[in-house]
């Protein structure tokens, strides 16, 4: 049992995301789908939530996983190390929490990986269209994702 996740459709309701009792935030959302791509390209794209993962996969970025929020934990770090990734593309939200998450990820992961934080024009990659994602990210991360 991993758990169930629900999201409020109102931006004013808090918390926005609800997890079932016993939900395992120690996992990386989508790792089971992304693992072959991560191994092949030695690169993982790290985003905050499930919706971000869905949108990135929709845009063709198959090596994307979610951390279930704005911080990474030790269990998730172990999974990242075991994934075969040497590079982490960090696409946390463009807000205070996302900036703190970026710093926390770098601090926790240390020198184990190479890091890239692409610039995006929206607060959240999950709010972008597939065309916007491809327009803004292709030139920034293409070199580390494709031979």
Across the structure, where does each feature detected by a protein language model lie?
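Short, small/acidic-rich helices and loops at N termini and domain boundaries
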Residues: 36-40, 126-147
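Short, aromatic/basic amphipathic alpha-helical patches
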Residues: 100-110
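A short acidic, often aromatic-flanked loop/helix-cap motif at beta-alpha or helix-coil junctions
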Residues: 119-127
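Acidic beta-strand-to-loop metal/phosphate-binding motif
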Residues: 46, 83-97
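Phosphate-handling DNA/RNA-contact segment within nucleic-acid enzymes
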Residues: 1-83, 102
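Short, acidic/turn-prone active-site loops that include or flank metal/cofactor-
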Residues: 68-72, 93-96, 119-120
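Conserved beta-strand scaffold positions in the cores of enzyme catalytic domains, especially
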Residues: 64-66, 113-117
């Amino acid at each position: 049992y991993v758990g169930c996740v629900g999201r409020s459709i109102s931006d004013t309701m808090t918390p926005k995301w609800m997890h079932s009792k016993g939900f395992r935030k120690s996992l990386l959302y989508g790792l089971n789908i992304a693992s072959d791509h991560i191994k092949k390209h030695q690169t993982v794209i790290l985003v905050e939530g499930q919706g971000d993962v869905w949108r990135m996969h929709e845009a063709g970025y198959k090596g994307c996983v979610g951390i279930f929020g704005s911080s990474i934990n030790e269990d998730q770090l172990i999974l990242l190390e075991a994934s075969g990734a040497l590079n982490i593309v960090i696409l946390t939200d463009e807000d205070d929490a996302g900036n703190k998450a970026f710093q926390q990820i770098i601090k926790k992961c240390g020198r184990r990986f190479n890091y890239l934080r692409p610039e995006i024009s929206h607060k959240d990659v999950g709010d972008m269209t597939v065309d916007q994602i491809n327009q803004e990210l292709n030139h920034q991360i293409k070199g580390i994702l494709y031979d």
